[in-house]
């Protein structure tokens, strides 16, 4: 009986497909974050290139790493709250 119950629990978990959701910071403050929507598997952080202090000006989730611009340098990562 216990084996049957355990099997049902495992099958339920597999069928639910609990899926992995990435959490990324989304403000300049390092303790505020959001869960990324499906398909957004990267966190990014943008800093000003010409400014001596490299504090982030923009953070969030992305499906692809944004390209650097004349003003902003982007750094991407794929682990929890890595930006």
Curated annotation (Swiss-Prot):
Q: Which Gene3D superfamilies match?
A: CD59
Recall the GO molecular function terms of this protein's record: toxin activity
**Per its UniProt record, what InterPro entries does this chain match?**
Cytotoxin_Cobra (IPR003572), Snake_3FTx (IPR003571), Snake_toxin-like_sf (IPR045860), Snake_toxin_con_site (IPR018354), Toxin_cobra-type (IPR054131)
Q: Where in the cell is it found?
A: Secreted; Target cell membrane
Q: Which UniProt keywords apply?
A: Disulfide bond, Membrane, Secreted, Signal, Target cell membrane, Target membrane, Toxin
Q: Which family does it belong to?
A: Belongs to the three-finger toxin family. Short-chain subfamily. Orphan group XV sub-subfamily.
| Reported function | Has low cytotoxic activity.
**What is the name attached to this protein's record?**
Cardiotoxin 7a
Instruction: Check the UniProt entry and state the signal peptide residues, or none.
Output: 1-21
- Which tissue types show expression of this protein? Expressed by the venom gland.
| Residue pairs linked by disulfide bridges in the UniProt entry | 24-43, 36-61, 65-76, 77-82
Q: Name one GO cellular component term.
A: other organism cell membrane
């Amino acid at each position: 009986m216990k084996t049957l119950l355990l099997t049902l629990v495992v099958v339920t978990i597999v069928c639910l497909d609990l899926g992995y959701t990435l959490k990324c910071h989304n403000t300049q403050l390092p303790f505020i974050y959001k869960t990324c929507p499906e398909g957004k598997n990267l966190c990014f952080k943008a800093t000003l290139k010409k400014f001596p202090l490299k504090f982030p000006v923009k953070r969030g989730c992305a499906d692809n790493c944004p390209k650097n611009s004349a003003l902003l340098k982007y750094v991407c990562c794929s682990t929890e709250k890595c930006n």
